[in-house]
Each structure stands twice: as structure tokens, then as C-alpha cells.
């Protein structure tokens, strides 16, 4: 999808058509809550998910909507061929050694018997 957006941006740029995309990360959507409700311990699963996020929280979908609104605004007229990642920093890199997950040794990443 990213390369398609870039190619379309090149193809249509001279016509003043901008092509961008948004790549969302974990969000507080209905699907997220269905997944949580199906868990044995929803509170623990949510805490684990939030702990994995560099910002420490699962994001509200409104943040994606706000990003799209900005990209549509005149203030973003110079943006084209861009992928804006709204994931709370998850894809920027993450140190899993500092995350407590049941059955995993945080120092080595290996499972415990």
C-alpha cells in the first residue's frame, strides 16, 4: 500500500492531486474490545498491551481521524506520497526486554518451562 501511495503521488502530482496514507497501530476500536472481552483476564491483557506501547496506552481512533483531517487541510498542501504512522511509537522500535509477559524471561526473551 505504501508503494502504491507513492506511485500514485508521482503519477497525479502534476494534476495537483495529493496521495497520502495513514497507518494506524493498536486502537480502542470495537474489534479491540471484542478481543479483550474474549480474554481470560481482560484487564491483564489490556495492561500487557498498554505496557508494550512506547506511549503507554492504546490510542483513541479519533487520533487517526485528526491526522486525516490535517492531511486534507491547506496547511498540509506540500504533503504527498507520505505514510503517516499513528501507532504511539510502536513501529519506531521497542525494547521488549523491559516488558513483563507471563512465561517469558525479559532478559533473554526465552520462554520458561
Where do the model's predicted regions map?
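A glycine/serine/threonine-rich, flexible loop-to-helix segment
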Residues: 14, 27-52, 95-113
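C-terminal helical subdomain
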Residues: 21, 43-79, 84-88, 112-113
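Alpha-helical segment proximal to the catalytic Tyr-Lys
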Residues: 10-11, 77
Amino acid at each position: 500500500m505504501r508503494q502504491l501511495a507513492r506511485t500514485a503521488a508521482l503519477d497525479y502530482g502534476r494534476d495537483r492531486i495529493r496521495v497520502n496514507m495513514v497507518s494506524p497501530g493498536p486502537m480502542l476500536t470495537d474489534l479491540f474490545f471484542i478481543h479483550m472481552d474474549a480474554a481470560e483476564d481482560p484487564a491483564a491483557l489490556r495492561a500487557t498491551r498498554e505496557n508494550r506501547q512506547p506511549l503507554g496506552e492504546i490510542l483513541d481512533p479519533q487520533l487517526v481521524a485528526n491526522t486525516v483531517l490535517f492531511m486534507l487541510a491547506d496547511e498540509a498542501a506540500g504533503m504527498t506520497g507520505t505514510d503517516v504512522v499513528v501507532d504511539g511509537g510502536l513501529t519506531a522500535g521497542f525494547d521488549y526486554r523491559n516488558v513483563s509477559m507471563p512465561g517469558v524471561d525479559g532478559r533473554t526473551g526465552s520462554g520458561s518451562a
